[in-house]
UniProtKB/Swiss-Prot annotation:
The lineage of its organism: Bacteria, Bacillati, Bacillota, Bacilli, Lactobacillales. It comes from the Bacteria. This is Peptide methionine sulfoxide reductase MsrA. Its EC number is 1.8.4.11. The keyword Iron does not apply. Belongs to the MsrA Met sulfoxide reductase family. The gene is msrA. GO terms for biological process: protein modification process. Keywords: Oxidoreductase. InterPro entries: Met_Sox_Rdtase_MsrA_dom (IPR002569), Met_Sox_Rdtase_MsrA_sf (IPR036509). Has an important function as a repair enzyme for proteins that have been inactivated by oxidation. Catalyzes the reversible oxidation-reduction of methionine sulfoxide in proteins to methionine. The keyword Oxidoreductase applies. It holds the Pfam family PMSR. The active site is at C10.
Amino acid sequence: MERAIFAGGCFWCMVQPFEEQAGILSVRSGYTGGHLPNPSYEQVCAKTTGHTEAVEIIFDPKQIAYKDLVELYWAQTDPTDAFGQFEDRGDNYRPVIYYTTERQKEIAEQSKASLQASGRFDQPIVTTIEPAEPFYLAEDYHQGFYKKNPKRYAQSSAIRHQFLEENWS
């Protein structure tokens, strides 16, 4: 099994697209990239810990390749927005691909270069590619949020879904 970590704005919106893929064993919401051990949601939202909201994905590379996960990641984000994602603003919502191996780093960098060269976006691709840091699980009420709170999830992801349809369909 391998591990992938992606930050793409609100972690609520990043779980479902990955959970629906064959070869995914788990997708958990959490926090990474900051300086405070085991932060709370309130601390991360206060923008004082340096963490991003992210998802940790455990996957079987025999069933789904890391490259495919990176491609799916791009299609869930606005890779031209370094200051958050959609209605969620701030460093804690910035887009980051966290790599756990040098091979993941190479794949992510190649994919980013290909996306930039594709001309899909007029602006530069600003998603950063950074080494994975400790990943802290978010509180239980954040796990599987789209299943537990479908109406609130739909409301909170409406702007994201509109952008994705316009730019990735």
